[in-house]
Amino acid sequence: MNTVTENVFPPREPKPKWLRVKLPTGKNYTELRGLVDKYKLNTICASGSCPNMGECWGEGTATFMILGNICTRSCGFCGVKTGRPETVDWDEPEKVARSIKLMKIKHAVITSVDRDDLKDMGSIIWAETVKAIRRMNPNTTLETLIPDFQGNTRNLDRIIEVAPEVVSHNMETVKRLTREVRIQAKYEKSLEVLRYLKAQGIKRTKSGIMLGLGEKEEEVIQVLHDLRDANVDIVTIGQYLQPSKKHLPVKEYISPEQFEKYEKIGKELGFRHVESGALVRSSYHAEKHIH
């Protein structure tokens, strides 16, 4: 049994007022919510209780998770189950494409669990999902939020060949905390993945980090420098929230002013888009990042 599931951390601090969100409303949200419930569509927006769900759905954007809901990794920040994943569903690409068509999604974000149990690490299903979406939804733009595929270029090439408008891979945290937060991942390997994607012709690359895990300001700024050095175009910076008592605790709630400071620094470094705020998640304002 891994340490993430065994540890029980101290009681959580109450959330500050700037982390409170209004319940989602609006015609677009209501219609999409009805479709998701009726057809049991698998969006991480709903299953992950994302605070921005109403806003994103109102803009015609949604995020879908493929390759099941059990991950082979046990990252200390992540609420996705860890264990032995189920058999690959080879009909999944068509199912996701149909969901996008039913929901009339203008911009779709696709993400997945890590599948280190598979020889191709899930990259074939990834590519087939993009192809199916393109066939069934020719006007829908795409972002693929990919795992590191252990840095295997053959698997990365499968993503590159289907040419999503945006390819993202999250650093998640600063270099010093990577081993504690991401466990099986490596900071430099993630940077190598992002460099490779850009070098092989991906037009827009993107990455994201969470704050509140004990990082220092200078470490956050260093991540921003490292991402720019890797020619990353877009960065998202948000507040880490503890999914359960068994996950890493929140060390600090970052103030709105500090998020604004990081946004200013990111823009000065030359990122095309910087999304920085307590409620920002990887897919926040994703539809704007294709430009």
UniProtKB/Swiss-Prot annotation:
Q: Pathway involvement? A: Protein modification; protein lipoylation via endogenous pathway; protein N(6)-(lipoyl)lysine from octanoyl-[acyl-carrier-protein]: step 2/2
Output the superkingdom of the source species: Eukaryota
Swiss-Prot/TrEMBL cofactor(s):
[4Fe-4S] cluster
Reaction catalyzed = [[Fe-S] cluster scaffold protein carrying a second [4Fe-4S](2+) cluster] + N(6)-octanoyl-L-lysyl-[protein] + 2 oxidized [2Fe-2S]-[ferredoxin] + 2 S-adenosyl-L-methionine + 4 H(+) = [[Fe-S] cluster scaffold protein] + N(6)-[(R)-dihydrolipoyl]-L-lysyl-[protein] + 4 Fe(3+) + 2 hydrogen sulfide + 2 5'-deoxyadenosine + 2 L-methionine + 2 reduced [2Fe-2S]-[ferredoxin]
Metal-binding recorded as keyword: yes
Query: Which EC number(s) does the record attach to this protein?
Result: 2.8.1.8
How and how many cofactors are bound, per the record note? Answer: Binds 2 [4Fe-4S] clusters per subunit. One cluster is coordinated with 3 cysteines and an exchangeable S-adenosyl-L-methionine.
Q: What is the enzyme's main class?
A: transferase
Per UniProt, which keywords does this protein have? Answer: 4Fe-4S, Iron, Iron-sulfur, Metal-binding, Mitochondrion, S-adenosyl-L-methionine, Transferase
Q: Where are the transmembrane segments?
A: none
Q: Where is the Radical SAM core domain?
A: 57-272
- Residues involved in [4Fe-4S] cluster 1 binding: C45, C50, C56, S283
The compartments listed are: Mitochondrion
Q: Which Pfam families match?
A: Radical_SAM
Q: Which is an annotated GO molecular function term of this record?
A: metal ion binding
Q: Which InterPro entries match?
A: Aldolase_TIM, Elp3/MiaA/NifB-like_rSAM, Lipoyl_synth, rSAM
User: What cellular component GO annotations does this protein have?
Assistant: mitochondrion
Q: Which family is it part of?
A: Belongs to the radical SAM superfamily. Lipoyl synthase family.
Further information in the entry reads: This protein may be expected to contain an N-terminal transit peptide but none has been predicted.
**The protein's name:** Lipoyl synthase, mitochondrial
Species classification = Eukaryota, Metazoa, Cnidaria, Anthozoa, Hexacorallia
